[in-house]
């Protein structure tokens, strides 16, 4: 949120450190504390920045070379530059830890936001009493989660076409990935720009939910779910948008599926028109029997590794030993799939799931797609056309395709299917 002008550095410091001011402190002491806090933060940025740079420019190149040689000599596939890109993404994710996300990558990504992100829209939402009292909404029924009753968040207008009519024109709300731990990465900008060119009359909004790369338990699950629902509510209620498409990749795929699940659990009437989950994070903390072994085999072709997947899962839920996250339907959507809930959801909005056959998450996504298909049996709301399995595709492949040639981009099979679904 934007800083209040009436708050001085003393108040800001204690708000960060203690969440409340217990006693009055002299201005001189506050200035010293504030300076010490800034120095400590700078030290952390420098230390973890140097650590990340050292690993990125020493360890990562070595493993990229080893991965490339392995492909060439084993001859399982024809070697191409795409394999180098996957290896770079995979090895880069392998060297990540919570501090690198918090003190290096997230500040860097924010600095790289395009000029169109200069004026965010802030949203403050009081969670409806009906949501809090719904017996099906475990976020509030499980009091150990300490779910907030008021949430604040923001979103950016990536593009707002001139003369946009919220009652008829489409709006795409794009929930970015990154394991809920990372800010919007620059790799998404090319995809969003191509979407803008493909649909000139479509507005594109990008939510900026709170990331989990922090020790603060209050910034872990379920905050992100509530923030994402708050953005959707703002779009349909305050902005009055009727033709809403919500899309997300990886953790963003988890987000868009959780939004409609939350709406159903709270017996809401307004749903998005379409939901597109690209390589959705269907289970954040749960692994099926044999799934880890499967992931260890598929990760050699993917851009994501098992180590980072597990790390993001731990960061998402945080340290709350009083909660069984394994059985939480928002944390592990596929594992706790509620057929009746999704039958109702699929009658109210169209859902599309895409993933690649080379993906680390393909095991859980295949099961999720099958469960959705079974839930829609006899209704034809979720058919084979709603599932795209890209042959030898990797994690969030459609988002990571950097082509600026619109003719070439729109003819990529995965992109073409997504565009067709949006236009249907």
UniProtKB/Swiss-Prot annotation:
According to its UniProt record, which residues of this chain constitute the active site? 250, 395
Is Endoplasmic reticulum a UniProt keyword of this protein?
yes
Q: Can you supply a Gene Ontology BP term from the record?
A: response to toxic substance
MF terms from GO for this chain are: steryl deacetylase activity
N-acetylalanine modification, residue list: 2
State the SUPFAM superfamilies in the record.
alpha/beta-Hydrolases
Mind telling me what this protein is named? Answer: Steryl acetyl hydrolase 1
- Identify the species of origin: Saccharomyces cerevisiae (strain ATCC 204508 / S288c)
Please spell out the taxonomic lineage of the organism that makes this protein.
Eukaryota, Fungi, Dikarya, Ascomycota, Saccharomycotina
